[in-house]
Structures are given as C-alpha cells and as structure tokens.
C-alpha cells in the first residue's frame, strides 16, 4: 500500500510516463501497462530490427493465404525446407515434429503393406532408412543435420538468396537471383524437384536469423508452391513466448523508448518483465535509465536493470499466475496457475503483473480497483483491441462449472498434502481460493482425467 502510494505520487508529478512491455509477459500484463501509461506511451521492449521482422512475419501469416499447421500437423508433411532458423534451439518442439515428419516415409511404406503405426519394428524393417526430404540452411551446424538430405552453411544473406532462387525456379513471376554458381544451382534443382513433387511441402523460417530477407524468401517459396496447387504449410518461429501477441498489440520499439529517456522527454519509466540488456546494449540501457527520476520494475526474476530501479514490484511467474499468450501459429493459449505462493509463505506479497499495474493505475486515479479477476481484464482487452477478440475463447471463464463443481487441480491420490506444511504448522489451513479460473486448488471438485476436453490439470 505504501509502495503504491509512493509510486503513484511520483507518477502524478511526472510530465511523461512511458511503459516498456515484454514479449515474455502475458497479453493481460502488457495491456495493463498500456492502460497505465496510455497507448501512445507504450513501447514493446523489442529492438527495432526485431520488431520490423515480427511485423513482416505477422503480415505473411495474415495476408499470405498459406496454412500454418499446428505442431501435431507438422508430422504429416512430406518435404520440409528450413530457412535460416536453427529450430532445435529456437523451437525444440517444432524440431521434434520435423523429425517425425521425415520418418513419415517409412510409415507410408508400411501403411501400403497394411502394417499398423504402432508396429515400430516392422515399420523400421520396411522403411530401411527411407526418409522424406529435409533441407536445412544455417550459419553453422545444427542438430537436425543428421537427418537432412542437404544442409547449406552460409552467411544469412546467401541463405536468403538461396530461398529467392528456389522461389524463382518454382514460379517464374518471383524475382530472379543472379550470380549463383553451377554446384549450388544443381542443389537448387534437387530442392525444387523435391518440393514440387511433394503433396504437402512445409516451409519453416523465423526472426532468429536476424534477417527480414530470409522471412520474405520463405514466404515467396510458400507462395510459389501454392501457385502450383500444392497443399503447402508455413511455420514462422518468433523469439519469445508472446512475441506474436505483443506484435498484435503494437507500440513503439525499445530504441524509441530509450530515445525518449535520453532526450529527457520522458521522466518516468515502468519496465514490465523485461531484461532490457537482452534487446539493446547494456551501456545505452544503463545510461538511459540513470536519467529517469523514477524507474519502476515489475518482474519475477532478478535482472541487471534492477540496479537502476527506484521501486521493484515482485510479480508472479508463469507457474504462479494465469494469463494468455499468442503462439507462433497466431493461436491464443491460456496458461494456468499451478500453486499459490502465499499458501507456503504467508509473508509473500506476490501478485500477477497485471494486478500490480492495475492497482497502481487505480491509485494514481484515486478510484477503486475494477479488475478483480482475469475475465475482467480479458473483457477490457477485447473491447480496446478487437484484433485480440479470440483470446476470450482460449479457455472457459472462471464461472465455468460441471454439475456445479469447479475442476479439481489435484487428483484423488494427491498423497502428502497434509504433510507439505507440517514443518510450519500441523494445523492445515484452508486451501487457497481461485477466483480467476475454473480450477480449484484442491481435490474437491470435478475429477475426470478421461473427459474429452483440454482443461485437464494433471496427467495420471
């Protein structure tokens, strides 16, 4: 309460307050910051170049007219081209799905002989190392090289040129590339043949190569294949868990925010769950923050910028809070709280980032808090940002019940619950009450792990 009042007093006196959001914070938390500082003073906390690549990626997904498969669907593709992205490091689950896709050739051969999918020994015997083609381009070796039909190691610019050359070979209307040597041209012919001959080719790229041209080249290849009538898919991989969501919210880049602080136009800054040193040079970040009379940091882990902070609010991590993120497919995904930290330590003052920011906003405006549960924030997001209307359907509301019961987080066999706090007190306190979701922090409630729904809180 005292910290809120102190911060609110300084914010009221500041001539311009800016907010720096984060691609690892939820939609709700970024939105709460945007509401606190105003849409014009909200910055994404992403470097300018990265943000431009993110916007290009969103443009490709929105306007390209090319299907983006889910992780499970990636396994059904029969030719894969990975352009400039080391997916084993930036999208490990995608890399696993690509491995499965490559093995799909053996499964197809086995299916033709009426061998079931589960008979793995028979499939391996029939397949005899037969694989669907996988082509990988990167600046260095990757951990997918062992199953790739061909790998191309070259500077990022040359990888983009390769992509554009493949697109041109598939479709004459795509821009041509000059100066490609004969050996590389022969390889391009092989790739073109494999992609053109596939029923379901998949193109994978992303922002991690640090090149807008690579993303453009991947889009051109996918478009050229679509023009040939192929059932083509495109997968784009972003850098952080909610990069896509932040791109859809919009706002200035981190470079713009630092310029505001450096020139003195902004004299207070609120940084949300963002280690700014990861997105800009440490010297520039520290110099910019040193100029601001108020630096308020909200985070769940200790970062170097806290050395420059005047006030730090301890936020709940993803395991201790609820929220929504937008994944690389552009699909909204809700994450749910696993436990309440204050149950194990009553001295803990740890709130979700959006609760801290909304509480601060309410204190600044001297009004009552009107977001008391997650659904209220989601309704406010949908009202202000219609492009995010789909987040409401990512999971049922907090009022969802089955036969009047919430869904139990704990299975009936949750042994040792009474002993978990015995070192603190042998008297077991009441279980925490969850007002944000349809789950209960206990065994009490509906418990159907085999029910046909995705809201299952445990694997048993």
Question: Which residue stretches match the model-derived regions?
Answer:
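Non-catalytic alpha/beta scaffold blocks inside enzyme catalytic domains
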Residues: 36, 46-393, 456-460
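Short intrinsically disordered, low-complexity coil segments enriched in acidic
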Residues: 1-7, 371, 402, 409, ...
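Short, Φ-rich (hydrophobic/aromatic) sequence segments
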Residues: 11, 26, 163-167
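RNase H-like polynucleotidyl transferase catalytic core
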Residues: 39-42
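Long, low-complexity segments enriched in small/aliphatic residues
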Residues: 216-219, 378-460
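Catalytic P-loop NTP-binding/switch module of NTPases
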Residues: 1-12, 16-22
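Cofactor-cradling patches in redox/metallo enzymes
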Residues: 20-30
């Amino acid at each position: 309460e005292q910290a809120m009042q102190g911060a609110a007093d300084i914010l009221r006196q500041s001539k311009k307050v800016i907010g720096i959001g984060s691609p690892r914070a939820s939609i709700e938390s970024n939105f709460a910051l945007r509401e606190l500082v105003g849409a014009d003073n909200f910055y994404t906390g992403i470097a300018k170049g990265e943000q431009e690549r993110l916007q290009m990626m969103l443009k490709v997904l929105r306007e390209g007219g090319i299907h983006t498969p889910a992780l499970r669907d990636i396994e059904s593709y029969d030719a894969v081209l990975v352009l400039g992205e080391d997916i084993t490091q930036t999208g490990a689950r995608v890399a696993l799905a690509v491995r499965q896709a490559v093995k799909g050739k053996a499964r197809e051969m086995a299916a033709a002989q009426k061998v079931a999918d589960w008979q793995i020994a028979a499939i391996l015997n029939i397949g005899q190392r037969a694989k669907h083609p996988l082509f990988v381009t990167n600046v260095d070796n990757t951990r997918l090289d062992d199953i790739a039909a061909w790998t191309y190691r070259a500077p990022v610019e040359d990888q983009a040129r390769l992509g554009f050359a493949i697109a041109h070979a598939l479709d004459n209307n795509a821009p041509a590339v000059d100066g490609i040597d004969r050996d590389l041209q022969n390889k391009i012919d092989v790739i073109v043949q494999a992609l053109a001959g596939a029923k379901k080719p998949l193109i994978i790229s992303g922002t991690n190569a640090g090149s807008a041209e690579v993303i453009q080249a991947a889009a051109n290849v996918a478009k050229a294949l679509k023009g040939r009538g192929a059932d083509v898919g495109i997968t784009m991989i972003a850098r952080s868990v909610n990069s896509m969501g932040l791109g859809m919210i919009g706002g200035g880049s981190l470079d713009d925010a630092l310029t505001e602080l450096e020139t003195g136009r902004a004299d207070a800054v609120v940084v949300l769950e963002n280690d700014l040193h990861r997105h800009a040079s440490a010297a520039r970040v520290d110099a910019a923050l040193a100029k601001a009379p108020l630096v308020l940091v909200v985070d769940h882990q200790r970062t170097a910028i806290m050395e420059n902070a005047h006030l730090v609010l301890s936020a709940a991590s993803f395991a201790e809070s609820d929220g929504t993120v937008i994944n690389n497919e552009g699909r909204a995904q809700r994450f749910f709280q696993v436990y309440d930290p204050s149950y194990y330590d009553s001295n803990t003052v740890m709130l979700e980032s959006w609760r801290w920011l909304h509480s601060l906003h309410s204190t600044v405006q001297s009004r009552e808090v009107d977001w008391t549960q997650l659904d209220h924030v989601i309704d406010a997001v949908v009202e202000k940002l219609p492009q995010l209307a789909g987040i409401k359907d990512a999971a049922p509301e907090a009022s969802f019940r089955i036969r009047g019961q919430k869904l139990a987080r704990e299975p009936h066999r949750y042994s040792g619950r009474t002993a978990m706090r015995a070192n603190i007190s042998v008297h077991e306190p009441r279980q925490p009450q969850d007002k944000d979701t349809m789950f209960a922090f206990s065994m009490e409630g509906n418990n159907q792990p085999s029910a046909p729904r995705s809201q299952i809180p445990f694997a048993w």
